[in-house]
């Protein structure tokens, strides 16, 4: 009986997705997010550099933090919904 129970526990663990899946916002609205695909382990937020209010113009998942440009400043983080 114990062997059957142990087997069922092992099968359950193997069948579950135990990998960490990061969730990032992907629109300007802060309550909409998506689960990032495998390999994308950062969330990013882009804001306009010259605009006084720092509204995000782009959000999403990334494998590397995008580089700042003349117009956009990127901020990256690695926890759920941190962008």
From Swiss-Prot:
GO terms for cellular component: extracellular region; membrane; other organism cell membrane. Expressed by the venom gland. Pfam families: Toxin_cobra-type. Residues 1-21 form the signal peptide. Keywords: Disulfide bond, Membrane, Secreted, Signal, Target cell membrane, Target membrane, Toxin. The keyword Secreted applies. Transmembrane segments: none annotated. It is found in: Secreted; Target cell membrane. Its main location: secreted. InterPro entries: Cytotoxin_Cobra, Snake_3FTx, Snake_toxin-like_sf, Snake_toxin_con_site, Toxin_cobra-type. Disulfide bonds join 24-43, 36-61, 65-76, 77-82. It comes from the Eukaryota. GO terms for molecular function: toxin activity. Belongs to the three-finger toxin family. Short-chain subfamily. Orphan group XV sub-subfamily. Non-cytotoxic protein that does not show lytic and hemolytic activities, but can induce aggregation and fusion of sphingomyelin vesicles. It binds to integrin alpha-V/beta-3 (ITGAV/ITGB3) with high affinity, and it inhibits osteoclast differentiation and bone resorption in mice, probably due to binding to integrin alpha-V/beta-3. This is Cytotoxin A5.
């Amino acid at each position: 009986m114990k062997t059957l129970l142990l087997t069922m526990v092992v099968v359950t663990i193997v069948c579950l997705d135990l990998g960490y899946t990061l969730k990032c916002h992907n629109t300007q609205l802060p309550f909409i997010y998506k689960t990032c695909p495998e390999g994308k382990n950062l969330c990013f937020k882009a804001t306009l550099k010259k605009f006084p209010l720092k509204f995000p113009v782009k959000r999403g998942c990334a494998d590397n933090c995008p580089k700042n440009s003349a117009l956009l400043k990127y901020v990256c983080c690695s926890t759920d919904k941190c962008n």
